């Protein structure tokens, strides 16, 4: 079955291709009475939108969202919400040279082998352009989470290449095109991007996303653990090759005595687990990290084959990002928000009447 949907109670289905007429999504399970406008959704779409800085693809799409259904007089009605974004700046001619050639590192070869046909224009369905609708759906989830539970979901660029960015100032994240929380690293990041553009090459990145004030109890053991669903959602983002929850792979070198999150009457003393224990949220901040590969759409010549199996030298044309991780921050936020909203609705349905005497912090 086609994997175009995510979620059970809060279910998001997306459709559309990079160079098609439009992108869209259907969102089921949104409770009625939530104030939502196109402007609310547009705020996050503008953060992801291409062509807004010299460090990202120069494809200029307004990404203007249209609400088709499910919202009346500014509030959700409880019925399916339909959203659409028109594609306006396609340059399909840029891809005519790869019609019969498989770009190395891309989905061209695997899509062709799976379906026997592929839309070669900008990667078709495999393009990161599809994530615009995830961000649109995530904006609705973020609004619900904040309004009903005080949950705040936000992300930042944690690393590009060898340049690491610590959280010095959360406010700084929205003040620069890198989503970097450390202003002292901006000059180095700018120099790296210039170097990559000159060389026609690309670089990978690490993004961190944090959800604060998440209620205790979210997650459905054993197969729908909160961390399992988060890993699934984040791993589905284009170019993501790794997901960590909490300290992730760093736990390999730790002792149990230092990794366990000890509890006192005042609360947890650490958060190595990333806010999830036994697949269930602990009430601490939920923390996840994703690693994104360097894009293969570069002008450095590389080896591949054509449809006839003949050796071909490949140079990718078109408009591309030297680091796809830069625009991944709002996408990662959206996927975490979608998963959290789905689990909040599932928790309310099954355990809404449960009252525990155990302290919460």
Swiss-Prot record:
Q: Which reaction does it catalyse?
A: 5-O-(1-carboxyvinyl)-3-phosphoshikimate = chorismate + phosphate
- Which residues are involved in binding FMN? 125-127, 238-239, 278, 293-297, 319
Specify the protein name.
Chorismate synthase
Q: Name one Pfam family in it.
A: Chorismate_synt
Q: What is its EC number?
A: 4.2.3.5
HAMAP family found in the cross-reference section: Chorismate_synth (MF_00300)
> Oligomeric state and partners?
Homotetramer.
Q: Which residues are NADP(+)-binding?
A: 48, 54
Cofactor(s) needed by this chain? FMNH2
Described purpose of this protein according to its UniProt entry: This reaction introduces a second double bond into the aromatic ring system.
Cofactor remark from the record: Reduced FMN (FMNH(2)).
The answer, when asked if Membrane is one of the entry's keywords, is: no
Q: Which GO terms describe its biological process?
A: amino acid biosynthetic process; aromatic amino acid family biosynthetic process; chorismate biosynthetic process
UniProt pathway:
Metabolic intermediate biosynthesis; chorismate biosynthesis; chorismate from D-erythrose 4-phosphate and phosphoenolpyruvate: step 7/7
User: So what family is this one in?
Assistant: Belongs to the chorismate synthase family.
Q: What is the lineage of its organism?
A: Bacteria, Pseudomonadati, Pseudomonadota, Gammaproteobacteria, Enterobacterales
State the InterPro entries in the record. Chorismate_synth, Chorismate_synth_AroC_sf, Chorismate_synthase_CS
Q: Name one GO molecular function term.
A: FMN binding
Q: Which GO terms describe its cellular component?
A: cytosol
Q: Does the keyword Chaperone apply?
A: no
């Amino acid at each position: 079955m086609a994997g175009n949907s995510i979620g059970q109670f809060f279910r998001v289905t997306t459709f559309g291709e990079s160079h098609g007429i439009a992108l869209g999504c259907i969102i089921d399970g949104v409770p009625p009475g939530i104030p939502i406008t196109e402007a609310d959704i547009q705020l996050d779409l503008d953060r992801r939108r291409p062509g807004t800085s010299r460090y990202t693809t120069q494809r200029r799409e307004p990404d203007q969202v249209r609400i088709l259904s499910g919202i009346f007089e500014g509030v959700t009605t409880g019925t399916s919400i339909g959203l659409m974004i028109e594609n306006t700046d396609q340059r399909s001619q840029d891809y005519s040279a790869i019609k019969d050639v498989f770009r190395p590192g891309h989905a061209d070869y695997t899509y062709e082998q799976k379906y026997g046909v592929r839309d070669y224009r900008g990667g078709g369905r495999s393009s990161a352009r599809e994530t615009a609708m995830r961000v649109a759906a995530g904006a609705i989830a973020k609004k619900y989470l904040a309004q009903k539970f005080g949950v705040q979901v936000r992300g930042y660029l944690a690393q590009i290449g060898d340049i690491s960015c610590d959280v010095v100032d959360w406010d700084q994240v929205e003040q620069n095109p890198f989503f970097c929380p450390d202003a002292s690293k901006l000059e180095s990041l700018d120099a790296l991007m210039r170097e990559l553009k000159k060389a026609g090459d690309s670089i990978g990145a690490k993004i961190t996303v944090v959800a604060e004030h998440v209620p205790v109890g979210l997650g459905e053991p054993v197969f729908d653990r909160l961390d399992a669903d988060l890993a699934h959602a984040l791993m589905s983002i284009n170019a993501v090759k790794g997901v960590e929850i909490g300290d992730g792979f760093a736990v390999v070198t730790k002792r149990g005595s230092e990794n366990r999150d000890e509890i006192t009457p005042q609360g947890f003393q650490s958060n190595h687990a990333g806010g999830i224990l036994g697949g269930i949220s602990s009430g601490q901040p939920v923390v996840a990290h994703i690693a994104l590969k360097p894009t293969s759409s570069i002008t450095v010549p590389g080896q591949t084959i054509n449809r006839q199996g003949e050796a071909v030298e490949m140079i990718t044309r078109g408009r591309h990002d030297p680091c796809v991780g830069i625009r991944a921050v709002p996408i990662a936020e959206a996927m975490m928000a979608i998963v959290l909203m789905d689990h909040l609705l599932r928790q309310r349905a099954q355990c809404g009447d449960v009252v525990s005497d155990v302290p919460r912090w």
